[in-house]
């Protein structure tokens, strides 16, 4: 009996795919992604035209299959898109958009792929304009921008930061963490850092007000002391005048 093989049925994805990315290797990797994601979301809190994600799968199969052609950048930003929650980034459901900026957080097990295979993918297929990588333990840090279809290394500025033309922000290392900086050189704060800064500002204002109050109290005490001294001098003069009058001496005729 001849067995008839059933034709392979393509696996089409559901409308919203979950990310297939594995857990991050170390707490420092997780912390780095949280810093990048939360600081940028806070800094662009008034914008609705971008999507930023960390450790999320990007599905980009030309056949719209979920089981082929997928990658998971550690951190990426897509510009000129709707800002809303997603479980993954599915290129064919996003008007063919790929990330504008990618940051890979290197580890010993992924560094070779990030420096080579992924770099070529982001350059030749995704055409991602800005690509950075950073090793949270060795502090290896490089960035590339797409020029005429090829990645060109971005030069460091005086602070050893790299400029992202897509983000209009600097990317640089501070306290062994990769951070964003404004064109003016100000650190892009996380929500926690902003709250701490606000608390510090309130505390400084409180201390300033307390210092002003103490200064005002000291000025009031000085004025009271001067008034008391004047009053004591007046009383002494009155007593002396009275004694002179008792002695038959007119104090107004003295002197």
Show the residue positions of the predicted features:
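A structured, charge-rich N-terminal accessory region that forms the first stable segment of a protein
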Residues: 30-43, 51
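A generic secondary-structure signal marking the coil-to-beta-strand transition
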Residues: 32, 48-50, 73-74, 99
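A short acidic/basic microdomain associated with nuclease active sites
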Residues: 46-61
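Short acidic/polar active-site loop segments enriched in Thr and Asp
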Residues: 129
């Amino acid at each position: 009996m001849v067995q008839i093989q059933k034709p392979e049925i393509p696996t089409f994805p559901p409308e919203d795919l979950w990310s297939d990315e594995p857990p991050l290797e170390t707490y420092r990797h997780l912390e780095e992604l949280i810093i990048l994601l939360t600081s940028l979301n806070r800094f662009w809190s008034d914008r609705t035209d971008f999507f930023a994600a960390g450790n999320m799968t990007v599905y980009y199969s030309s056949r719209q299959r979920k089981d082929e052609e997928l990658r998971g950048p550690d951190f990426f930003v897509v510009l000129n898109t709707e800002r809303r929650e997603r479980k993954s980034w599915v290129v064919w459901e996003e008007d063919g958009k790929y990330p504008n900026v990618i940051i890979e957080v290197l580890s010993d097990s992924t560094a070779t792929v990030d420096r080579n295979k992924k770099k070529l993918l982001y350059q030749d297929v995704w055409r991602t304009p800005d690509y950075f990588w950073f090793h949270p333990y060795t502090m290896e840090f490089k960035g590339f921008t797409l020029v005429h279809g090829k990645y060109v290394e971005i030069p460091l500025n005086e602070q050893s930061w790299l400029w992202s033309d897509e983000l209009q922000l600097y990317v640089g290392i501070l306290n062994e963490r990769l951070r964003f900086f404004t064109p003016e050189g100000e650190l892009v704060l996380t929500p926690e850092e902003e709250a701490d800064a606000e608390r510090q500002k309130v505390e400084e204002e409180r201390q300033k007000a307390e210092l002003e109050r103490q200064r005002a109290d000291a000025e009031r005490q000085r004025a009271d002391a001067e008034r008391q001294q004047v009053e004591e001098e007046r009383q002494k003069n009155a007593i002396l005048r009275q004694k002179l009058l008792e002695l038959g001496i007119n104090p107004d005729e003295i002197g």
